[in-house]
């Protein structure tokens, strides 16, 4: 089974992808992670990508496609893949079809985590973590039992990510919509797109995704 998982930053894609990995033994293919790993390992594709990046240029679709092909070739035949961050354009969608078909695979599901922009802004801008142990909290939804003290380690210092601000979140939402708009109709025409309420409880989101996978 091969899945594309869509959703803006903060929608919970990472959590749901990890649960799919744990439950179904699938492999998460994140283009960013694959690129960094290939460059570090100095594979032929990695060296090509490194040269492009050092020249200050964007990594081409051809290089990304080669990375994905290499990853799929290294996977057992029966292992499913979760595509994260790819495809983002119509040409990339066509390329992915060709990559999968040449390896006897096909795309089974495109699952989009649907979110309310205002609610997502509230979710992201309110989150913070303990500077000592990393336990997560939220201004509204998950406060420490004792204000100013971490429930887990008793620490008193907390931190927020610098990009967890409203302007950045809304910019990322706009970028996400612009990037996914061209590819969704391609997959909708095949009847493989499903939408899940990404604002629901994480366990409910997982249950909804599992129901989609079980239905086909």
Swiss-Prot record:
ATP binds at residues 10-15, 127, 200. Belongs to the adenylate kinase family. AMP binds at residues 31, 36, 57-59, 85-88, 92, 161, 172. Its main location: cytoplasm. It comes from Novosphingobium aromaticivorans (strain ATCC 700278 / DSM 12444 / CCUG 56034 / CIP 105152 / NBRC 16084 / F199). It catalyses: AMP + ATP = 2 ADP. Monomer. Its EC number is 2.7.4.3. The keyword Cytoplasm applies. This is Adenylate kinase. NCBIfam families: adk, PRK00279.1-2, PRK00279.1-3, PRK14527.1, PRK14532.1. Keywords: ATP-binding, Cytoplasm, Kinase, Metal-binding, Nucleotide biosynthesis, Nucleotide-binding, Transferase, Zinc. One of its GO terms (molecular function) is zinc ion binding. HAMAP family: Adenylate_kinase_Adk (MF_00235). PANTHER family: NUCLEOTIDE KINASE (PTHR23359). The lineage of its organism: Bacteria, Pseudomonadati, Pseudomonadota, Alphaproteobacteria, Sphingomonadales. It is an enzyme of class 2 (transferase). Zn(2+) binds at residues 130, 133, 150, 153. Residues 30-59 are annotated as: NMP.
